[in-house]
């Protein structure tokens, strides 16, 4: 019995150490899959045209599709920094009208909800430091639900 308790304690400790040491790969793994925009605000105003768009992460790539899924709106690579507070994400556009531009943002998870705030489309604006898109900020705040 004491051996079982020792093994269980060891497993719990090992799990905690793995989670505590979770770095960029773990953050990237959590993002993987598709997310549907459920709410959006840009520069202090509702951004209803964004609601319904689907953001998909595959490996180190991202893709944003139109509401009906027929059009790729943006695509490129992304990188995260879990050590930044709040955690940061950069979307590097590799095709389309924003090719060569990098949107700098922040992100957070709450269960199957992903919240991002970034400086798209005005890349001259600074990376957001809070989850808000106040008038004049040039920031866009989007809430996503994990797609089934």
Give residue ranges: language-model regions.
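Bacterial N-terminal signal peptides
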Residues: 7-20
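Short Gly/aromatic-enriched secondary-structure transition segments
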Residues: 50-53
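N-terminal helix-cap/turn-to-beta initiation motif at the start of protein domains
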Residues: 20-36
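C-terminal partner/receptor-binding element of secreted or periplasmic proteins
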Residues: 135-148
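Contiguous, well-ordered beta-strand patches that form the walls/edges
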Residues: 37-48, 61-133
């Amino acid at each position: 019995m004491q051996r079982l308790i020792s093994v269980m304690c060891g497993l719990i400790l090992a799990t905690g150490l793995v989670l505590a040491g979770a770095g960029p790969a773990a953050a990237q793994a959590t993002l993987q899959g598709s997310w549907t925009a459920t709410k959006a605000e840009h520069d202090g105003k509702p951004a209803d045209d964004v609601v319904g768009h689907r953001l998909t992460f595959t490996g180190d790539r991202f893709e944003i599709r139109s509401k009906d899924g027929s059009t790729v709106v943006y695509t490129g690579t992304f990188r995260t920094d879990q050590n930044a507070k709040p955690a940061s994400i950069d979307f590097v556009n590799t095709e389309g009208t924003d090719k060569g531009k990098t949107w700098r943002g922040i992100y957070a998870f709450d269960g199957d909800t992903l919240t991002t705030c970034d400086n798209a489309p005005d890349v001259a604006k600074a990376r957001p430091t809070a989850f808000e898109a106040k008038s004049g900020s040039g920031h866009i705040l989007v809430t996503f639900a994990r797609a089934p």
